[in-house]
Amino acid sequence: MRKVALITGASSGIGKETAKLLVQQGYTVYGAARRTEKMQDLEQAGVKLLAMDVTDDAAMVKCVDQMLQAEGRIDVLLNNAGYGSYGALEDVPMSEARYQFEVNIFGMARLTQLVLPQMRKQRRGRIINISSIGGKLGEPHGAWYHATKYAVEGLSDSLRMELKEFGIDVVIIEPGAIITEWAGIAREHMLKTSGNTAYGELTRKHAAMFERADKMGSQPIVVAKTIVKAITANRPKTRYATGGGAKLILFVKSLLSDRMFDSLMLRMMKQTDRQVWTNSFLPK
């Protein structure tokens, strides 16, 4: 019997690449996104498309019901849909802050609620939650985004213990800098929100760093391969840091005090070459 996987945010980047790999592995894959017109290549590859907005409860219920009626099972849920809108905390409207939580946390949690009854019935399943190294550290202008990713980490750790007796694994994926449309969207929002406020100078420096980091990031396929490894492993790790210098950055973070890491982050924004970490490793 073919295993069934549901992937959110499948219209681009990590979600799209993971869908392709799982089809090649013999999975029945449902790819969900708001923009199904961007998934025609996935449909041709054998992915079944679902129009889903993770902030729309009725749409999520409908899609899960449709999938379960057709397949009778769900083996993997990849909570990949995400949204990043940067700006100084003082400048970001509360409506925008709430929307980030709706997409990155509440949508993830609700979709998980919807698939869990079937997974418990099967007494097996795997939930893969896309976090970020941003769930382990902060940076200027990212207060709301990082808050959502810290929440993903805490939610996943608690859920893992709740589901152990049912044979359901919960795995956290922590990507570093990845070349996707996400960075461009976050950069654009940051400049629009704080580029001409009291935080303007730091904002412009940060935006320039985003542009450099995007060029040095890993391709989405790097993270997708890690996700497939987590899905297919007999006993997966509880979390995987992957791509875009993720392991190095988290290692450096573990060595430094909070104030030392703050200084490192702020100094990185002044760098103009690829030696950001070498030049900035220790405070001067």
Regions found by a protein language model. Give the residues of each.
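Active-site helix of classical SDR
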Residues: 112, 148-151
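Substrate-binding pocket helix/loop in short-chain dehydrogenase/reductase
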Residues: 88-89, 96-98
